[in-house]
Regions:
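Helical segment within the ABC ATPase nucleotide-binding domain
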Residues: 1-2, 13
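Conserved H-loop
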Residues: 2-8
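Catalytic "switch" loops of ABC-type ATPases
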Residues: 10-11, 51
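A short, surface-exposed alpha-helical micro-motif characterized by mixed small hydrophobic
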Residues: 15-17
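Short, glycine/charged-rich "phosphate-handling" switch motifs in NTP-dependent
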Residues: 21, 33
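Catalytic metal- and UDP-sugar-binding loop of GT-A-like glycosyltransferases, i.e.
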Residues: 25
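Charged, flexible cofactor/metal-binding loops and thiol motifs
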Residues: 35-128
Length: 128
């Protein structure tokens, strides 16, 4: 149809049912984008992984639900570098200092993360 619709929701199951492609936002910035199937089955950004791990699933029935650790940054005082770095379990010094750019890591998958590098699809740790 050649139709584009901006559908904003924190209900990722609904968004995936309605949309063929997703853009994951954190603190007003796209941190990951790609096909709904790819993002749900192979999330790359630490925020996407943390967000998806908090969602209720049949396998988690009866378990205590968790939240993404930490707090959202104040919109008027956002941190330098990656906006998710204060909450990220894989944060490195570069994450604190330099804002990551959106890099293509697959046919239609892109991520803004210093920990995930677009080098032959391999994950790299910075500072090693």
């Amino acid at each position: 149809l050649g139709l584009s619709v901006l559908f904003i929701s924190s209900n990722i199951a609904l968004a995936a049912a309605v949309c063929s492609n997703l853009g994951i936002l954190y603190s007003g910035e796209i941190v990951e984008s790609g096909s709904a199937k790819d993002i749900l089955q192979n999330p790359q950004h630490c925020y996407t992984k943390a967000f998806l791990s908090c969602l209720p699933t049949p396998e988690k029935k009866g378990m205590v639900m968790t939240a993404v650790p930490g707090r959202m940054p104040d919109p008027l005082m956002k941190p330098e570098g990656c906006k998710f770095h204060p909450r990220c379990s894989q944060c490195e010094q570069i994450c604190r200092e330099t804002r990551p750019m959106l890099h293509t890591i697959g046919n239609s998958h892109a991520v803004a993360c210093h920990i995930v590098a677009p080098l032959d699809g391999e994950k790299l740790r910075t500072g090693e």
